[in-house]
Amino acid sequence: MFTINAEVRNEQGKGASRRLRTANKFPAIIYGGNEAPLAVALDHDKVMNMQVKAEFYSEVLTIVVDGKEIKVKAQDVQRHPYKPKLLHIDFVRA
C-alpha cells in the first residue's frame, strides 16, 4: 500500500503551479464522494518513485493531509512531453 504526504494548496493557477514545480513539488486534486474537491501539493520525487510500479494505478492509495488519511485511486496523470516529470495527478476518493 502506498502512503503519500500532501499539503493543502492555498494558491491556484499557472503561476502558483510553476512555483510548486520549481520547489520540487507538483499540484494534484482529490475529488469525488460527498466532500468538496481538495487541491493539494505532492513531493515530486517520492511520487515519481511510487508511480513506476503498476500497483500505483490499480490499488487504493492513502494520502495524508493535515493528519487526516484519505483513501484514493489515481484517475488521471499528466506528464511532461519529453522530460521525466509529473505535472498533475487527479485522484478520486475510494
From Swiss-Prot:
GO MF annotations, alphabetized: 5S rRNA binding; structural constituent of ribosome
GO cellular component: cytosolic large ribosomal subunit
Keywords: Ribonucleoprotein, Ribosomal protein, RNA-binding, rRNA-binding
InterPro entries, alphabetized: Rbsml_bL25/Gln-tRNA_synth_N, Ribosomal_bL25/Gln-tRNA_synth, Ribosomal_bL25_short, Ribosomal_L25_dom, Ribosomal_uL5_bac-type
GO biological process terms held by the UniProt record: translation
Ranges that cross the membrane: none
Superkingdom of origin: Bacteria
Protein purpose: This is one of the proteins that binds to the 5S RNA in the ribosome where it forms part of the central protuberance.
Record text on subunit structure and interactions: Part of the 50S ribosomal subunit; part of the 5S rRNA/L5/L18/L25 subcomplex. Contacts the 5S rRNA. Binds to the 5S rRNA independently of L5 and L18.
UniProt family annotation: Belongs to the bacterial ribosomal protein bL25 family.
Protein name per UniProt: Large ribosomal subunit protein bL25
Classification of source organism: Bacteria, Pseudomonadati, Pseudomonadota, Gammaproteobacteria, Enterobacterales
